[in-house]
């Protein structure tokens, strides 16, 4: 008998090693009909594969991300088959499913463009209608090599040659198209009905600029037209909201070839940064933090002791001072530890919550840089909490309460993932278990739903990752709460207990925004540049109808500035319509229009970005309402 264990803990017995598809059918007719793929002992597995005795098995349908991944993987093969029909002689490299679709890398004399997409999509639809079965074949290494050599598919030959000798080599055949692939795939091409080719880009073979440049066609696929239409809408909206474009339009920041990946913040961008830091400093005060600042450059000895030299060296920048090796800090933690150790701490000092807006530098490949989302230097709103083991759970709960406030003020919902021990980690199993359990107990006590993200913890400890959801429904990993019992061991971080003896402290790393730069990029796209009044770089724009109203406009601005309202006067000698359109492009929360009538009555005419024309008001009344809106941080 062969026994498998299902997700709900129940066991199912079979007389022989039936396929996963047959196993699903035996469990229930509904599952047999709807299952598309399975996980066997955590590995995504094709339903054609046989069950394994003692394995943990979980099935997935089109309602699951794993089901969509499988559809897109098959769609990449359908696209490749269509291209083979239309452009004979194309050599195929790799064609994986990715987060929002799939792609295929091609070597062809034909230069692909979007003009080819209609013909390719038409051929794909034809292949889908034929509902061609996908047949999985496992071949001996030599036979697989010879097959692709005979077909002239050089890249497939190289891929096989790179595989370990003991690796199982599988091919998927669909009609006249056969591809080297580990799977998983749909049963047939019939489900690949809703798709769209998106763009063409260049991609070096194996990502190495020394190799040949291939052509990469990006595409996407969904189970329904509604899902595809929604994806295309979000994508189009995201292009309008691109923080790189809006950053330039709103004069917030810039990048220069003299420093790729190193952002330059302009005066208006600095207002955004400072307002975000001011808000977190208020939270520091509310939740009992002190603030420090530590150096940007520290000795190699420190990074050897911390473990960063062994585990993070490829992401660091280095220099020499007085013939000694130094590194520009990629993380703030060792500096925080040195601060803690400047005095002998007592249990009465704990928990000690130490915050820092620390500038860190991490090396990123030039091709990976992406506006404020992927940079080489950024500010982390880091904090390190030093505590006893008994305080771990309560401190994690307090951090989560802080994040609830932090994200709530921006109208950002979030979900949480518990990221566990990665392969490249340090420390004993016992300490990892204690740390992971502390995070799990805290989040369960707080009643916050969470998912497990296996193997994605930091090298020194497990963590909770907070993924915020923006106005387009996209998620961004921002906050972290990382438990660390490793660095306190390495640095002998201790405190004097009630018994008068030294005890090892526990260290918790937390960052709410994560990267201040990245969070600003997220907010730009979340709000489409139309920031809430309290963080808007310019809160009101005074627009004189004609030049003779300019002095009155300046007096209104001066009065508002006295109440710490950020205000600008539009002094351009242009038409009123032009000046209003310009303020709209700048996405200013309030336009204040002053003409002869307003001068005569000592009033202002107010237009709200949110609520339209608010009519004539007295300046004191408008200022009072605006101050209230700013103070309450209306979103």
Could you tell me what each predicted segment is?
Residues 1-91, 98-635:
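NTP/phosphate- and nucleic-acid-binding module
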């Amino acid at each position: 008998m062969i026994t498998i264990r299902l997700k709900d803990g129940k066991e199912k017995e079979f007389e022989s090693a039936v396929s996963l598809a047959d196993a699903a059918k035996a469990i229930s007719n509904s599952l047999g009909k709807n299952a598309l793929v399975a996980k066997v002992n955590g590995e995504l597995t094709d339903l054609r594969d046989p069950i394994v005795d003692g394995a943990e098995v979980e099935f997935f349908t089109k309602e699951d991300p794993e089901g969509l991944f499988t559809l897109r993987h098959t769609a990449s093969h359908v696209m490749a088959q269509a291209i083979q029909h239309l452009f004979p002689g194309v050599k195929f490299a790799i064609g994986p499913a990715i987060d929002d679709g799939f792609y295929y890398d091609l070597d062809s004399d034909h230069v692909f463009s979007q003009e080819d997409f209609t013909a390719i999509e038409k051929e794909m639809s034809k292949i889908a209608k034929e509902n061609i079965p996908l047949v999985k074949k496992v071949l001996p290494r030599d036979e697989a090599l010879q097959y692709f050599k005979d077909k002239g598919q050089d890249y497939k030959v190289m891929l096989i040659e790179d595989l370990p000798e003991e690796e199982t080599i599988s091919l998927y055949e669909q009609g006249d198209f056969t591809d080297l692939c580990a799977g998983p795939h749909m049963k047939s091409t019939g489900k690949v009905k809703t798709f769209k080719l998106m763009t063409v880009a260049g991609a070096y073979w194996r990502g190495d600029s020394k190799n040949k440049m291939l052509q990469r066609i990006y595409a996407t696929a969904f189970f329904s037209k509604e899902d595809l239409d929604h994806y295309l809408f979000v994508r189009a909206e995201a292009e309008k909201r691109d923080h790189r474009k809006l950053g330039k339009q709103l004069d917030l920041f810039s990048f220069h070839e003299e420093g790729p990946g190193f952002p330059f913040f302009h005066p208006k961008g600095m207002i955004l940064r400072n307002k975000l830091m001011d808000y977190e400093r208020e939270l520091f005060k509310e939740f009992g933090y002190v603030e420090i600042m530590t150096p940007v450059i520290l000795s190699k000895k420190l990074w050897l002791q911390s473990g960063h030299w062994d585990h993070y060296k490829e992401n660091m920048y280095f220099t020499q001072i007085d013939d000694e090796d130094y590194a520009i800090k990629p993380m703030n933690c060792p500096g925080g530890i040195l601060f803690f150790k400047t005095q002998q701490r007592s249990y009465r000092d704990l928990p000690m919550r130490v915050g820092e807006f620390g500038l860190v530098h991490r090396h990123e490949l030039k091709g990976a840089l992406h506006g404020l989302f992927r940079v080489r230097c950024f500010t982390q709103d880091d904090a390190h909490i030093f505590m006893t083991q008994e305080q771990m759970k309560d401190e994690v709960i307090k951090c989560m309460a802080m994040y609830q406030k932090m994200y709530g003020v921006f109208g950002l919902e979030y979900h949480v993932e518990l990221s566990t021990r990665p392969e490249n980690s340090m420390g004993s199993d016992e300490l990892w278990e204690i740390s992971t359990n502390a995070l799990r107990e805290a989040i369960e006590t707080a009643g916050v739903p969470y998912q497990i993200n296996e193997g994605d913890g930091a090298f020194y400890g497990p963590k909770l990752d907070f993924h915020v959801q923006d106005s387009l429904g996209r998620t961004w990993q921002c906050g972290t709460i990382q438990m660390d019992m490793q660095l306190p061991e390495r640095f002998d971080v201790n405190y004097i207990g009630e018994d008068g003896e030294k005890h090892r402290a526990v260290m918790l790393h937390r960052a709410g925004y994560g990267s201040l730069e990245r969070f600003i990029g997220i907010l730009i796209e979340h709000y489409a540049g139309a920031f809430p009044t309290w963080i808007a770089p310019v809160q009101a724009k005074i627009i004189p109808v004609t030049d003779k109203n300019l002095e009155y406009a300046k007096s209104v601005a001066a009065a508002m500035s006295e109440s710490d309202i950020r205000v600008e006067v539009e002094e351009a000698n242009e038409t009123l319509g032009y000046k209003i359109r310009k303020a709209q492009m700048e996405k200013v929360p309030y336009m204040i229009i002053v003409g002869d009538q307003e001068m005569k009555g000592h009033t202002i005419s107010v237009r709200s970005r949110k609520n339209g024309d608010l009519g004539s008001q007295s300046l004191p009344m408008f200022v009072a309402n605006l101050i209230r809106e700013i103070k309450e941080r209306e979103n």
